[in-house]
From Swiss-Prot:
Lineage: Bacteria, Pseudomonadati, Pseudomonadota, Gammaproteobacteria, Enterobacterales
Molecular function GO labels: glyoxalase III activity; protein deglycase activity; thiolester hydrolase activity; zinc ion binding
Family as reported in the entry's similarity comment: Belongs to the peptidase C56 family. HchA subfamily.
PANTHER family to which the protein is assigned, alphabetical: PROTEIN/NUCLEIC ACID DEGLYCASE DJ-1-RELATED (PTHR48094), PROTEIN_NUCLEIC ACID DEGLYCASE 1 (PTHR48094:SF20)
Induction record: By heat shock.
Enzymatic reactions: N(omega)-(1-hydroxy-2-oxopropyl)-L-arginyl-[protein] + H2O = lactate + L-arginyl-[protein] + H(+); N(6)-(1-hydroxy-2-oxopropyl)-L-lysyl-[protein] + H2O = lactate + L-lysyl-[protein] + H(+); S-(1-hydroxy-2-oxopropyl)-L-cysteinyl-[protein] + H2O = lactate + L-cysteinyl-[protein] + H(+); N(omega)-(1-hydroxy-2-oxoethyl)-L-arginyl-[protein] + H2O = L-arginyl-[protein] + glycolate + H(+)
The name this protein goes by in its record: Protein/nucleic acid deglycase HchA
Organism of this sequence: Shigella boydii serotype 18 (strain CDC 3083-94 / BS512)
Keywords from the UniProt entry: Cytoplasm, DNA damage, DNA repair, Hydrolase, Metal-binding, Stress response, Zinc
Active site, per annotation: 185 (nucleophile)
Residues of the signal peptide: none
Length: 283
């Protein structure tokens, strides 16, 4: 007999009217083991350049019916790219807008993954004790050691990052100083921070999570309601081209902006980023 899993969002008792994804959606879109592979970098980078991770610091995303989606950064989208980059020789630092700890979607953590989980435990303190982004931005100059800015996905990237002047300043610095910008899924929502000023990403092409898919997720209880706005629409208004309209694990390179469409792209994006950064900094 087939056991039917519920499509009702699960209550998050830590907050009023807040919900995790349904059992059904978790059964379809999460796994206890990731698809990490291809971590093979025989000549890793040995220098001082590193990655700046701009992480989410808020968990609760309001939906159109007033219910809150319990979110944060998606663990697969965060950890798999970083695993590849770390293996390629690039250390990383974590910053949030507030300087408060990173929020993760722990319901998507690959708890039985024998490579990813030790990596997370090894670096957990960076996520628990991040830098304040404004302090990082104040120190940026042409000689700064950050080789890339990485904005992980998860719906937590929709909260605060698109309105942050510090996010805008960090992205402007990266593009103007020929650094890499890496993101996937909902992470490119952070690019919206550029829409009210100098926008060096105008005309760039990226992969991102499709708005059409976000509009379908409440049907399976992934979110407890519909989003109140859609970041893809807004990115297009600011002159960006989203090249995918579905979720296939696709990645894309436009100059030094490297993007992926979903958690299914996390491993491939990690490979792409590691290869591109090694070519740029260890060649």
């Amino acid at each position: 007999m087939t056991v039917q899993t519920s499509k009702n969002p699960q209550v998050d008792i830590a907050e009023d009217n807040a919900f995790f994804p349904s059992e059904y959606s978790l059964s379809q879109y999460t796994s206890p083991v990731s698809d990490l592979d291809g971590v093979d970098y025989p000549k890793p980078y040995r220098g001082k350049h590193k990655i700046l991770v701009i992480a989410a610091d808020e968990r609760y995303l309001p939906t159109d019916n007033g219910k809150l989606f319990s979110t944060g950064n998606h663990p697969i989208e965060t950890l798999l790219p970083l695993y590849h980059l770390h293996a390629a020789g690039f250390e990383f630092e974590v910053a949030t807008i507030s300087g408060l700890m990173t929020k993760f979607e722990y319901w998507a953590m690959p708890h039985k993954d024998e490579k990813v989980m030790p990596f997370f435990e090894q670096h957990k303190s960076l996520f628990r004790n991040p830098k304040k982004l404004a302090d990082v931005v104040a120190s940026l100059n042409a000689d700064s050691e950050y080789a890339a800015i990485f904005v992980p996905g998860g719906h937590g990237a929709l909260i605060g990052l698109p309105e942050s002047q510090d996010v805008a300043a960090a992205l402007q610095w990266a593009i103007k100083n020929d650094r890499f910008v890496i993101s996937l899924c909902h992470g490119p929502a952070a690019f919206l921070a550029l829409r009210h000023g100098d926008n060096p990403l105008n005309g760039y092409s990226i992969c991102a999570f499709p708005d059409a898919a976000d509009k379908q997720t409440p049907e399976i209880g992934y979110m407890p309601g519909h989003l109140t706005w859609y970041f893809g629409e807004e990115l297009k208004k600011m002159g960006m081209n989203i090249i995918n309209d579905d979720i296939t694990g696709r990645v894309h390179k436009d100059r030094k902006v490297l993007t992926g469409d979903s958690p299914f792209a996390a491993n491939a994006l990690g490979k792409l980023a590691a290869q591109e950064m090694l070519a740029a900094y260890a060649g």
